[in-house]
């Protein structure tokens, strides 16, 4: 892996790796946890998802492995009760390129990766613990799929860190969810600052600054509203209804002060 690309060869995969592959012309990526023996555990939409009612739903439907009519002899039939599934690596990639998500990156590295959903400032737990969490959630589920609060990237980041956002009105861990809506929001919120400059380059720099600040502030490794919740406790709370997926308002994205 390098500064500009997280692409890796299959030979370098280790159990516990958080991997992903781009879908739909690089608009969105599908994420999962490699658990060894050519297997990937990942979170998909299986008819229980909370959608947006927008074109994003069509994009995210295609983020998971394609459901073709050819039966894969090595893949485990999915549990229809929840969206956590185990697939072979080929089915997970669905013809795409393999990438590895990075953890414990520094601030400069994080901001250079302008596209969200490729790295985080958060520290990952040991790989054997990551695999245990993924396998536990395969048996017990990860709640209801939500585009912004509980998607495949949120699942993989949780398996790696056990960190959860506890405040229901804010966004989940997903960096690519912030990227999808962060750009338009940055453009809107930087509009008042355009009064301070008529230079087109200054306007662009302002919008980029707001976008980068929002990505940095909402990264799971920087947020103050997160807690470590182990998988057994998480699934117990999910089954008892103590955790619920709610639609977060866009205003929940942290932004820099203009004062």
Swiss-Prot record:
Loss of function: phenotype: Increased sensitivity to lead ions (Pb) stress mediated by Pb(NO(3))(2) associated with a reduced Pb accumulation leading to decreased phytochelatin (PC) synthesis and related gene expression. Higher sensitivity to hydrogen peroxyde H(2)O(2).
GO biological process per UniProt: cellular response to lead ion; lead ion transport; phytochelatin biosynthetic process; response to lead ion
Keyword Cytoplasm attached: yes
Expression induction or repression: Induced by lead (Pb) stress (Pb(NO(3))(2)).
Tissue-level expression: Highly expressed in inflorescences, siliques and stems, and, to a lower extent, in roots and leaves.
One Gene Ontology cellular component: cytoplasm
Keyword tags: Cytoplasm, Stress response
Compartments it resides in: Cytoplasm
Pfam families: LRAT (PF04970)
The keyword Cytoplasm belongs to this UniProt entry's keyword annotation: yes
Protein name: Protein LEAD-SENSITIVE 1
UniProt source species: Arabidopsis thaliana
Gene encoding the protein: PSE1
């Amino acid at each position: 892996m390098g500064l500009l690309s997280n692409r890796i060869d299959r030979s370098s995969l280790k159990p516990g790796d958080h991997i992903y592959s781009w879908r739909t012309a690089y608009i969105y990526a599908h994420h999962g946890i490699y658990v060894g023996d050519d297997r990937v555990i990942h979170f998909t939409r299986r008819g229980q998802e909370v959608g947006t009612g927008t074109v994003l739903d069509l994009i995210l439907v295609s983020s998971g492995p394609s459901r073709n009519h050819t039966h894969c002899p090595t893949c485990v039939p999915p549990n229809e009760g929840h969206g956590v599934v185990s697939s072979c690596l080929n089915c997970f990639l669905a013809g795409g390129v393999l990438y590895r998500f990075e953890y414990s990156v520094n601030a400069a590295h994080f901001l250079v990766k302008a596209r969200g959903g490729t790295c985080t400032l958060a520290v990952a737990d040991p790989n054997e613990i990551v695999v245990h969490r993924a396998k536990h959630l395969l048996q017990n589920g990860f709640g209801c799929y939500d585009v912004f609060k509980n998607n495949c990237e949120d699942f993989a980041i949780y398996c790696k860190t056990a960190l959860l956002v506890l405040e229901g009105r804010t966004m989940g861990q997903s960096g690519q969810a912030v990227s999808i809506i962060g750009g338009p929001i940055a453009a809107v919120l930087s509009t008042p600052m355009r009064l301070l400059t008529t230079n087109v380059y200054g306007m662009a720099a302002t919008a980029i600054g707001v976008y980068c600040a929002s990505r940095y502030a909402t990264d799971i490794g920087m947020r103050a509203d997160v807690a470590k919740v182990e998988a057994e406790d998480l699934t117990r709370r999910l089954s008892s209804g103590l955790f619920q997926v709610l639609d977060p308002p866009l205003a929940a994205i942290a932004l820099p002060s203009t004062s």
